[in-house]
UniProtKB/Swiss-Prot annotation:
Protein name as catalogued: V-type ATP synthase alpha chain
Gene Ontology MF terms in the entry: ATP binding; proton-transporting ATP synthase activity, rotational mechanism; proton-transporting ATPase activity, rotational mechanism
Family assignment from sequence similarity: Belongs to the ATPase alpha/beta chains family.
Catalytic activity: ATP + H2O + 4 H(+)(in) = ADP + phosphate + 5 H(+)(out)
Species this protein is from: Clostridium botulinum (strain Hall / ATCC 3502 / NCTC 13319 / Type A)
Class of this enzyme: translocase
Protein purpose: Produces ATP from ADP in the presence of a proton gradient across the membrane. The V-type alpha chain is a catalytic subunit.
Gene3D superfamilies reported for this sequence: 2.40.30.20, 2.40.50.100, Bovine Mitochondrial F1-atpase, Atp Synthase Beta Chain, Chain D, domain 3 (1.10.1140.10), P-loop containing nucleotide triphosphate hydrolases (3.40.50.300)
Binding site for ATP: 231-238
Keywords: ATP synthesis, ATP-binding, Hydrogen ion transport, Ion transport, Nucleotide-binding, Translocase, Transport
Length: 590
């Protein structure tokens, strides 16, 4: 391949000449240290190259060699439990080769070429296969069965296939189509900027259970859905993302740390091996892929890290798994776009972001979905994408937030005021929304309880009434309210503090199953119904608010999943206490 020459260097942007044989999005090696870059613009024989490593030390005249291939990821056994940088270089392998700091031009394979995996065929010689068909399985971790699929573009009859221990580049099967014989390895490559093909998209109808009460009850996201978590600094975006990565009922989690602080990735690395998956009892790390592209790594690689992560997510989706992808934070990705756009001297849009910010964000989020995979056997997989957005100063009218809100169906708006009041997760129930509620309400009513939707609507209306009553209280004081309105305020407070508030660092409260959420919500609303009955019978509000059973309602969140029937005892106690108050006839008649 012909070698070009560096003409100009501007931070992560390098312009090279003599590149007439190259194509846009080709990967190139720049300079004597062979820095990895990607062509993002071609003008005659000049190529504008986005370099994914530090460009200090490059000089005009340095060689630029094109590989003739687009930026691709290696897909195969070895992805789970691994930690990659933004362009899928394994950080453990880099540390072994170059020490604690990533040196320029270091080259390592994304997947280990020496490790052997036990391949068990599920097809036999003579079977006809096509792209997407599963030919064998590898038990990658104790909970992830890695399915080896026929790569896109290959079909035919299996000539040879054998069981045994192989590396990812060994031939495990041969497929013959007419006169052409294709060798199948356990590894395949896929360009990151192109979505992997699928048979057809399905309407998402099943919720992704997260164990976070405010999300599952009020603003659920479906498997295959899209959601965003915008919020100012310190409002808890990363903790929400960590909670979702820990407890979401997805089979695989892909966590992309895009331009955020390194200690947040350290938290994940420290916590996930210790925490147990509630369904399998195995460490959470055994179902997780980490992509660490922290704030002290080159800016340009942030742009690639988002695509690297979603391509890995699509690969596992094609196996028929449910995937949850967390991107923290898409604002840093947008800032990388803005920096490259500025250096390319493109016409700026709002706040300096490129005019194509909205279309790039849409390209990313539309790769989510609930799909039927390609292949002769139907497999249904789901890829759920949850992106954090970090608007400066919490201003939700800024371009990245607005571009994201036009695309995603769920908005979990984090509120600085709630965070300052130590209400976590600080998701504002008055601003947030989910457009999936109507689709998943039938599933909830069928699988959790027939009155789930009714309880949810009742609780939300109480919280909304509280907001309007608080305005009256601020103007004329609480004494202007009737006892029934004051009861509403108390029940709404109970909903906020005893139900919506959740401690991510408490061993019991960090996760609540749907069954427990239903009983807790019903308990708070049962108190409201019983208290209304008592008020109508002449009982005074103060007596109701002083009941000891209210402490038990507040502590219901700390009842473990094994002892969930203890909540039923609180229902019975509450009924008895209210009946006693009514029979006594109120404080004046006592």
């Amino acid at each position: 391949m012909k070698t070009g020459r560096v003409l100009k260097i501007s931070g992560p942007l390098v312009v090279a000449e003599g590149m007439e044989e190259a194509n846009i999005y080709d990967v190139v090696k720049v300079g004597e240290k062979r820095l990895i870059g990607e062509i993002i613009e071609m003008r005659e024989d000049r190529a504008s190259i986005q370099v994914y490593e530090e460009t200090a030390g490059l000089a005009p005249g340095d060689p630029v060699i094109t590989t003739g291939e687009p930026l691709s990821v290696e897909l195969g056994p070895g992805l789970i439990e691994a930690m990659f940088d933004g362009i899928q270089r394994p950080l453990n392998a880099i540390k072994a080769k170059a020490g604690d700091f990533i040196t320029k031009g270091v080259e390592v394979h994304s997947l280990d070429r020496d490790k052997k995996w036990h391949f068990t065929p599920v097809k036999k010689v003579g079977d006809t296969v096509e792209a997407g068909d599963v030919i064998g399985i590898v038990q990658e971790t104790s909970i992830v069965e890695h399915k080896i699929m026929v790569p896109y573009g290959i079909k035919g009859t299996i000539e040879t296939i054998e069981e045994g221990d192989f590396t990812v580049v060994d031939t495990v099967a041969k497929v013959k189509d007419k006169d052409k014989v294709s060798d199948l390895m356990m590894m395949q490559k896929w360009p990151v900027r192109r979505g992997r093909p699928y048979g057809r998209k399905l309407n998402p109808a099943q919720p992704m259970i997260t164990g976070q009460r405010v999300i599952d009850t009020f603003f659920p996201v479906t498997k295959g859905g899209t959601a965003c978590v915008p919020g100012p600094f310190g409002s808890g975006k990363t903790v929400v993302q960590h909670q979702l990565a820990k407890w979401a009922d997805a089979q695989i989690v892909v966590y992309i740390g895009c331009g955020e602080r390194g200690n947040e990735m350290t938290d994940v690395l420290n916590e996930f091996p210790e925490l147990k998956d509630p369904k399998t009892g195995e460490p959470l790390m055994k179902r997780t892929v980490l992509i660490a592209n922290t704030s002290n790594m080159p800016v340009a690689a942030r742009e690639a890290s988002i695509y690297t992560g979603i391509t890995i997510g699509e690969y596992f989706r094609d196996m028929g798994y449910s995937i949850a992808l967390m991107a923290d934070s898409t604002s840093r990705w947008a800032e990388a776009l803005r920096e490259m756009s500025g250096r390319l001297e493109e016409m700026p849009g709002d706040e300096g972001y490129p005019a194509y910010l909205g279309s790039r964000a849409a390209e990313f989020y539309e790769r989510a979905g609930n799909v039927v995979s390609i292949g002769s056997e139907e497999r249904e997989g789901a890829l759920t994408v949850i992106g954090a957005v970090s608007p400066p100063g919490g201003d939700l009218s800024e371009p990245v937030t607005q571009a994201t809100l036009r695309i995603v169906k769920v908005f979990w708006g984090l509120d600085a005021q709630l965070a300052y009041r130590r209400h976590f997760p600080a998701i504002n129930w008055l601003n947030s929304y989910s457009l999936y509620i109507e689709k998943i309400s039938p599933w909830m009513d069928e699988n959790v309880a027939s009155d789930w939707t009714a309880l949810r609507i009742k609780a939300m209306s109480l919280l909304q009434e509280e907001a309007s009553l608080e305005e009256i209280v601020r103007l004329v004081g609480i004494d202007a309210l009737s006892e029934k309105d004051r009861l509403k305020l108390e029940v709404a407070k109970s909903l906020r503090e005893d139900y919506l508030q959740q401690n991510a660092f408490h061993e019991v409260d960090t996760y609540a199953s749907l069954g427990k959420q239903y009983k807790m919500l019903k308990l708070v609303l049962f108190f409201y119904d019983e208290a209304q009955r008592a008020l109508n019978a002449g009982v005074y509000l103060k007596e109701l608010l002083d009941l000891e059973v209210r402490d038990k309602i507040a502590r219901a969140k700390y009842i473990s999943e094994e002892n969930i029937e203890n909540i039923d005892a609180i229902f019975n106690e509450l009924s008895e206490v209210i009946d006693q108050l009514i029979s006594k006839g109120g404080i004046m008649n006592a």
